[in-house]
């Protein structure tokens, strides 16, 4: 057990979270379990493997078999592209859920972004000029509740991914932290669009001061061409199983996924390690993905001295430095200074009767009941609306992946507001540069 775990501070923290009544995301974390990284930076994990992120865009009606080494007889471009999308999605999971434990020894709580905080950067892909440049924009669009929206786009290959995330947390009797994600991701590859839901997770090892993330539940990847991938996550039990395990099944349509034997492919293994793929009616498996064979490409971010005051690394510079030094008193002092400044700004806005203007994202109403001028109404041909309809996914503000008629869908939830990137706002941006 670590030095912190044996201290009275750790004991006090365990007591506070075990007795806390409400959403734990609103509970301030003690300095010694903080990460020096803001949550706005997590958006970069979606594209840290540029080759895998862009590969689906390189597949066409003539070369699709060349892009499917584990099945040279893949039946169509649509199937090959879905397989490439699934492989890219699996590649993002290790960065999103394991990288901090691997680099810092255990999971740490990221810094909670303030309203209007932004994080931007790019992957120049100099060694692969055919990839072109990929841009990341991340913005904290809400503080109560915390919500981060992001957009990643590569204009050369006509690929983009956007989404937003919000979480609600709680504790079990065994002090396992449960996390329900809200929001979703939309991947656009030329003329195809994919709706991706994110899985619930739980954080174990808290009692022994060595937290780690384990995924549970399922994710959906629904394509505009009708194809569907259902990914089921599981972890290591007391007697059986391996950590970070998953099974993904690919179907021609959502109607077929009620019977697992309809799956065209079964992909299984560990999302943090190696996975294999088996085609329907075949007994031969092939390697699908090995996370150790594809190192991440880090985002290029401007030096802190060149950043806007709202950019994450500049805004949190003093706090992050204190965390790296392990200076508990300085962490508390610098963090409180920043947070008090933000509270003062919110109070000024309240007195003036104004609301903080988001830079690059707008809310869209899928029930068309919101009368605010800042909220747009979703059109009938909206990509999320159409893909959710194919999957029978609830468009309400319920946990990600909730199907129509599911337990959370039946609750009294009267809103269906989701954040969308507005590229015109980015094109008019004159203060923040990549």
Swiss-Prot record:
It is found in: Vacuole membrane; Bud neck. It comes from Saccharomyces cerevisiae (strain ATCC 204508 / S288c) (Baker's yeast). The gene is HES1. 20-hydroxycholesterol binds at residue 96. GO terms for cellular component: cellular bud neck; cytosol; fungal-type vacuole membrane; membrane. PROSITE patterns: OSBP (PS01013). Transmembrane segments: none annotated. Cholesterol binds at residue 96. GO terms for biological process: endocytosis; exocytosis; maintenance of cell polarity; piecemeal microautophagy of the nucleus; sterol biosynthetic process; sterol transport. It comes from the Eukaryota. Keywords: Lipid biosynthesis, Lipid metabolism, Membrane, Phosphoprotein, Steroid biosynthesis, Steroid metabolism, Sterol biosynthesis, Sterol metabolism, Vacuole. Ergosterol binds at residue 96. Residues 18-371 are annotated as: OSBP-related domain (ORD). A 1,2-diacyl-sn-glycero-3-phospho-(1D-myo-inositol 4-phosphate) binds at residues 24-29, 109-112, 143-144, 335, 339, 343. The OSBP-related domain (ORD) mediates binding of sterols and phospholipids. It displays an incomplete beta-barrel containing a central hydrophobic tunnel that can accommodate a single lipid molecule with a flexible lid covering the tunnel entrance. The ORD can bind two membranes simultaneously. It has at least two membrane-binding surfaces; one near the mouth of the lipid-binding pocket and a distal site that can bind a second membrane. Lipid transport protein (LTP) involved in non-vesicular transfer of lipids between membranes. Functions in phosphoinositide-coupled directional transport of various lipids by carrying the lipid molecule in a hydrophobic pocket and transferring it between membranes through the cytosol. Involved in maintenance of intracellular sterol distribution and homeostasis. Plays a role in ergosterol synthesis. Binds and transports sterol. May be involved in ergosterol transport from the plasma membrane (PM) to the ER. 25-hydroxycholesterol binds at residue 96. 7beta-hydroxycholesterol binds at residues 96, 100. Pfam families: Oxysterol_BP. Present with 1690 molecules/cell in log phase SD medium. GO terms for molecular function: lipid binding; oxysterol binding; sterol transfer activity. InterPro entries: OSBP_sf, Oxysterol-bd, Oxysterol-bd_CS. This is Oxysterol-binding protein homolog 5.
């Amino acid at each position: 057990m670590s030095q912190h775990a044996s201290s009275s501070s750790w004991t006090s923290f365990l007591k506070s979270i075990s007795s806390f009544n409400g959403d734990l995301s609103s509970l301030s974390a003690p300095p010694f379990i903080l990460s020096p990284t803001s949550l706005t930076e997590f958006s970069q994990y979606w594209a840290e493997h540029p080759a895998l992120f862009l590969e689906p865009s390189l597949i066409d009606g003539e070369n699709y078999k060349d892009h499917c080494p584990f099945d040279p007889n893949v039946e169509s471009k649509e199937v090959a592209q879905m397989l490439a999308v699934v492989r890219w999605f699996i590649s993002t999971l290790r960065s999103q859920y394991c990288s901090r434990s691997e680099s810092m020894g255990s999971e740490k709580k990221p810094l909670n972004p303030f309203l209007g905080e932004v994080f931007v950067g790019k992957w120049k892909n100099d060694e692969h000029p055919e990839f072109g440049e990929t841009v990341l924009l991340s913005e904290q669009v809400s503080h109560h509740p915390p919500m981060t929206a992001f957009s990643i786009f590569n204009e050369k290959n006509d690929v983009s991914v956007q989404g937003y995330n919000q979480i609600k947390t709680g504790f079990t009797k065994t002090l396992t932290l449960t996390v329900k994600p809200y929001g979703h991701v939309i991947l656009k590859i030329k003329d195809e669009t994919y709706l991706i839901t994110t899985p619930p997770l739980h954080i174990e090892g808290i009692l022994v001061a060595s937290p780690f993330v384990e995924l549970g539940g399922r994710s959906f990847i629904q394509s505009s061409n009708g194809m569907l991938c259902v990914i089921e996550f599981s972890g290591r039990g007391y007697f059986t199983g391996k950590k970070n395990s998953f099974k993904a099944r690919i179907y021609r349509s959502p109607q077929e996924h009620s019977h697992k034997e309809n799956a065209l492919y079964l992909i299984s293994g560990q999302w943090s390690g190696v996975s294999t793929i088996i085609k329907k009616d075949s007994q031969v498996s092939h390697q699908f993905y090995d996370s150790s064979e594809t190192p991440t490409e880090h985002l290029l971010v401007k030096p802190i001295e060149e950043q806007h005051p709202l950019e994450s690394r500049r805004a949190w510079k003093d706090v992050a430095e204190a965390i790296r030094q392990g200076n508990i008193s300085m962490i508390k002092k610098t963090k409180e200074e920043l947070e008090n400044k933000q509270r003062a700004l919110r109070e000024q806005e309240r007195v003036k009767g104004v609301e903080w203007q988001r830079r690059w994202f707008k809310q869209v109403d899928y029930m068309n009941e919101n009368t605010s001028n800042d909220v747009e109404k979703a059109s009938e041909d909206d990509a999320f609306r159409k893909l959710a309809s194919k999957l029978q996914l609830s468009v309400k503000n319920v946990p990600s992946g909730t199907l129509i008629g599911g337990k959370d869908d039946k609750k009294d939830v009267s809103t269906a507001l989701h954040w969308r990137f507005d590229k015109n706002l980015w094109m008019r941006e004159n203060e923040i540069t990549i």
